[in-house]
Amino acid sequence: MAKEFGRPQRVAQEMQKEIALILQREIKDPRLGMMTTVSGVEMSRDLAYAKVYVTFLNDKDEDAVKAGIKALQEASGFIRSLLGKAMRLRIVPELTFFYDNSLVEGMRMSNLVTSVVKHDEERRVNPDDSKEG
């Protein structure tokens, strides 16, 4: 039976905290002027690769999001070196940054559900308006 919370998950969780601190305190790139949040980290089983999922505070502008991801990719070597100092790992994983749109999609879905519920309540209050011919 497989472990439910193995070493890759524990390392990913700790790495998420450390990368968030590094982005907050060490990275001074003007392309990352917007607040960056690390929403998740997925580790490979051999701990050699990490997918880092980030969100940005002002993520309405698609060009700014692309520039932010590009800036993070370019700074990945620096972030990796700081991770090596902060965490005791034999191999510091290669970092790949991705934009996490799950928060935006979740808010969109929530708004859709809210509008459907509101429309349904309006139909219950005024049933004559919704009858057709």
Swiss-Prot record:
One of its GO terms (biological process) is maturation of SSU-rRNA. InterPro entries: KH_dom-like_a/b, RbfA, RbfA_dom_sf, Ribosome-bd_factorA_CS. It comes from Escherichia coli O127:H6 (strain E2348/69 / EPEC). GO terms for cellular component: cytosol. GO terms for molecular function: ribosomal small subunit binding. Keywords: Cytoplasm, Ribosome biogenesis. One of several proteins that assist in the late maturation steps of the functional core of the 30S ribosomal subunit. Associates with free 30S ribosomal subunits (but not with 30S subunits that are part of 70S ribosomes or polysomes). Required for efficient processing of 16S rRNA. May interact with the 5'-terminal helix region of 16S rRNA. Its main location: cytoplasm. Monomer. Binds 30S ribosomal subunits, but not 50S ribosomal subunits or 70S ribosomes. The gene is rbfA. Belongs to the RbfA family. It is found in: Cytoplasm. This is Ribosome-binding factor A. It comes from the Bacteria. Disulfide bonds: none annotated.
